[in-house]
Every structure is written in structure tokens, then in C-alpha cells.
Regions:
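Charge-rich, well-structured scaffold segments of protease-associated domains
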Residues: 34, 91-241, 258, 276, ...
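Boundary at the C-terminal end of the N-terminal hydrophobic targeting segment
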Residues: 21-27
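His/Glu-based metal-binding/catalytic segments typifying zinc-dependent metallopeptidases
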Residues: 241-297
Length: 436
């Protein structure tokens, strides 16, 4: 069997898996409705299981924060679950459990989220609960200190762990003054200043109908969901008071940072600025990242770990962003091997710029990438999340299908082209017990 034939079969298998995982979990494509007040509703009818999931995204996150309030979005999301005008924190939790599901909240760079699940027969009460938390949180002052302490503890913990510390450092260096360079947990000094009134003002600024995306997936009908959501969110403010932030440009620059810290494993991270999700090069960079660092068959694993024995762990990542993206590779190694491991990893980054990936490598990367994507979209909770996520990133909920087709169309020449375009100005961070 030729390499081209094997490549075609591998991609076909991955697309079949993608279809089974996503198609079997969804009886319809998401139906998009924009209410008169500006709120966006995405409904995916799926009668395969008697479960309903809702993901409420609001365009609020670290991208809209400054050094003075860094971490406020994550803090707000946690405190919102501590009580509303009609429910205490215990009643929120008990209501969610009584519906046969749960509720949680979090913040990220480009969005913040309230997510909840329930048995399908309880979907209206589920919407009641989500709307209550989103629109009527009391943000009790007595709960703020506890959540703040938890975030400060998590920040200190990241400073004590080699990989999180190295990752936070490389993000800060590659992004410079851009808000993506700050941890989602924020800055300790900023968190100490945030009080009840500050959280109330932040909530009022961002939780407005034009900034809200509500995705619902499950055994429901779109017409009924739209009507019920419109009724529950009728009181949401229609004014847009938080325009897109004026962000400094993230400019590619060669940079090297050495962190000296006691650690059983040395860390080496190499990062590059990369295109946002909406960019035409996004699928090709995803394939590039997978060919290098995706799973046990990626070049970094096979060449640096298996063949040369220079790493305990290694991989690559290219997170999806609305703004400038980042692609990074990472390895953990014995401190004595740090210098050689870094040379080996940089060598693989150089080789993928010089040499096209083989047909089998290309097929494996596509199969792994599409297979993992399909497997991650098997539940209503993940379907709702992806629908809201892609809408928040500005590519629309139908991006999942377009993305699969775009990945299938990526060629070896595309992979080499984006490698030569984006893997040119490395930001390197090393961490170990002594300068290596």
C-alpha cells in the first residue's frame, strides 16, 4: 500500500470517527437566534439522550482586564455562585442537583462561562437557574474573601510548580504587554484591591444581552427554548458598555529566560506567536502542532524522548484564541540533560521548516487531531460548550464542520509553509536547579 493510500485511509477513518462522535450526539445543527435585546441563542436539538446542557458565555475575560484588576473575571464567576436575589449558595447547588445535573462557572481569556446540566424534563428549571445566576447575583461580601484566598493560594502554587511557572513565564515573555500574557487567575496585588462594589460594577459592565451567548443542547425543541430564554432574559440590559479592548500588539521577538529553581525535572519551553482561530492558516498550524507534539507518534516524542532518551515528557500545544495565538513545545528532562534536550527540540523545530512531513506523518496528524476533536464532542455538555466557544471566538457554531473539512485539505506543503512563516522567532524559557 502506498504512503498516499495509507494517508487517505487514515484521514477517512478519522472523519468517520468524527462523524460518529459528533453526528450520533446531535440530531441537528445548531440553530442561531439573536433576540431583540442582542442576546445570541444557539440551540442544538438532540434526542439521543434524556439530558440537556446549557453553556452561557459572556464576552468577559482576562482580555478585557488590566494590571489594576487582573483576575477580576475569574473572581466574579466564583462569587456569582454564592447567592442570587432568590437563592442562597446552598439552594443553587441543591437546585442543580435536584435537576439531575450540576452548575459551575469559570473564566478564560476570551470569555467567561456558566455551565449547567439537567435531565431533559427539567430544562425550563435549568434555564431559570442559569438566568438567576447570570442576571441576579448578590455577590455577598462575606464570600469574596474566601474565593480571593483560594485564588491567591492557586497563584502561589503555580509559582512553586516547575511546569506552570515556566508556562506562565513563557506566555508573559511571548505576549509582552498584551493581556494574554497575564494568568487568568490574575495578579496578587490586583486581587487584594477588589471588593464588593468593584465586582458589582464589573458584572454590570459585562453581563449585558449583546455580550451573552447561550448555547443549549439536548432533548428539546429550538422554538420552545428560544421563547423561554427570551422571557427569562427580557430584563437584561441592552446597552453595550464594554467595547473591544484597545490591546497592545503582540510583536514576535527572539527572547530567552533562564529560571533557576530546585526541581527534580528541568523544563524547556519554546513558544512562537501564531494566528488566531479565524485566520486561514489556523487548520494548517493545528496539523503542524500535532505532527510535532500530538501524542506518542509526534516527532518530539519519537525523536527526543524515544530515540535519544532526552526527555521524560514532551509535547506541543496551539490553543484557540480570538486574538493572537501562541504555539509552544515543551519537555521535561533530567537537569543533566537540559542543554542537550533543548538542542534536540530546537533541531526538530528547524527540521520541520526544512523538510516536508511524510505522507504517513501527515495522515497520522490529521487522524489524531480529528479523532480527538470528535471524541471531545460526544456529550450534550461538550456540544453546547463548543457551539458557544466558536461563537465567542467569532467563527460561528458551524465552524466544527468547516474545521474538519479544512484539516482534511491540509497538505504537506501547507505544513511546511506555516512552519516557515510562524516558527521563526522563538521565545525560550528554561527552568532547572542551576543554569545549564
Amino acid at each position: 500500500m502506498t504512503g498516499r493510500r495509507r494517508a487517505a485511509l487514515a484521514v477517512a477513518a478519522a472523519l468517520t470517527l468524527l462523524g460518529v462522535a459528533a453526528g450520533a450526539a446531535s440530531a441537528s445543527e445548531p440553530q442561531r437566534t439573536r433576540l431583540a435585546n442582542g442576546l445570541t441563542i444557539l440551540v442544538r436539538e438532540n434526542a439521543a439522550t434524556p439530558v440537556v446542557a446549557a453553556s452561557l458565555f459572556v464576552r468577559m475575560g482576562s482580555r478585557w482586564e488590566t494590571e489594576d484588576n487582573a483576575g477580576i473575571s475569574h473572581l466574579l464567576q466564583q462569587v456569582m455562585l454564592k447567592g442570587t436575589a432568590t437563592r442562597s449558595a446552598l439552594e443553587i447547588a441543591e437546585t442543580a442537583e435536584g435537576l439531575g445535573g450540576g452548575i459551575s462557572a469559570s473564566a478564560d481569556m476570551d470569555y467567561s462561562e456558566i455551565r449547567a446540566t439537567a435531565l431533559a424534563r427539567n430544562w425550563k428549571t435549568l434555564l431559570d437557574l442559569v438566568a438567576d445566576v447570570a442576571l441576579r447575583p448578590t455577590l455577598p461580601a462575606a464570600e469574596i474573601d474566601g474565593e480571593r484566598r483560594a485564588m491567591l493560594t492557586a497563584l502561589r502554587s503555580r509559582q512553586d510548580q516547575p511546569f506552570p511557572l515556566a508556562l506562565d513565564t513563557v506566555m508573559s515573555r511571548v505576549y509582552g504587554d498584551h493581556p494574554y500574557g497575564r494568568p487568568i487567575l490574575g495578579r496578587a496585588a490586583a486581587l487584594e484591591r477588589i471588593d464588593h462594589d468593584t465586582l458589582v460594577a464589573h458584572h454590570r459592565r459585562f453581563y449585558r444581552a449583546p455580550r451573552i451567548i447561550l448555547a443549549v443542547s439536548g432533548d428539546i425543541t429550538a422554538r420552545e427554548v428560544v421563547a423561554e430564554v427570551a422571557r427569562r432574559f427580557a430584563g437584561a440590559s441592552t446597552e453595550e458598555s464594554a467595547p473591544e479592548p484597545l490591546e497592545p500588539s503582540a510583536a514576535a521577538r527572539a527572547d530567552r529566560t533562564v529560571l533557576v529553581k530546585p526541581a527534580a525535572q528541568a523544563q524547556v519551553l519554546v513558544a512562537f506567536l501564531a494566528p488566531p482561530t479565524a485566520h486561514p492558516d489556523y487548520p494548517a498550524v493545528k496539523v503542524l502542532a500535532t505532527a510535532l507534539g500530538g501524542g506518542m507518534a509526534g516527532r518530539l516524542f519519537t525523536e527526543v524522548r524515544d530515540k535519544q532518551g532526552l526527555a521524560y515528557s514532551t509535547g506541543g500545544s496551539y490553543p484557540s484564541r480570538r486574538g493572537p495565538g501562541v504555539f509552544y513545545t515543551q519537555l521535561g528532562t533530567a537537569p543533566a540533560n537540559q542543554a542537550r534536550a533543548e538542542v534536540a527540540m530546537l533541531g526538530e523545530l528547524d527540521r520541520i521548516r526544512r523538510e516536508p512531513v511524510s505522507p504517513s506523518e501527515l495522515a497520522r496528524a490529521k487522524a489524531y487531531l480529528l479523532g480527538q476533536f470528535g471524541l471531545d464532542r460526544r456529550t450534550n455538555a461538550r456540544l453546547a460548550w463548543y457551539d458557544a466557544f466558536f461563537e465567542a471566538l467569532g467563527v460561528g457554531p458551524d465552524f466544527a464542520d468547516r474545521y474538519a473539512q479544512a484539516v482534511e485539505a491540509v497538505t504537506a506543503e501547507d505544513v511546511q509553509r506555516v512552519a516557515r512563516t510562524y516558527l521563526t522567532t522563538p521565545t525560550i524559557v528554561t527552568l532547572g536547579p542551576a543554569a545549564q
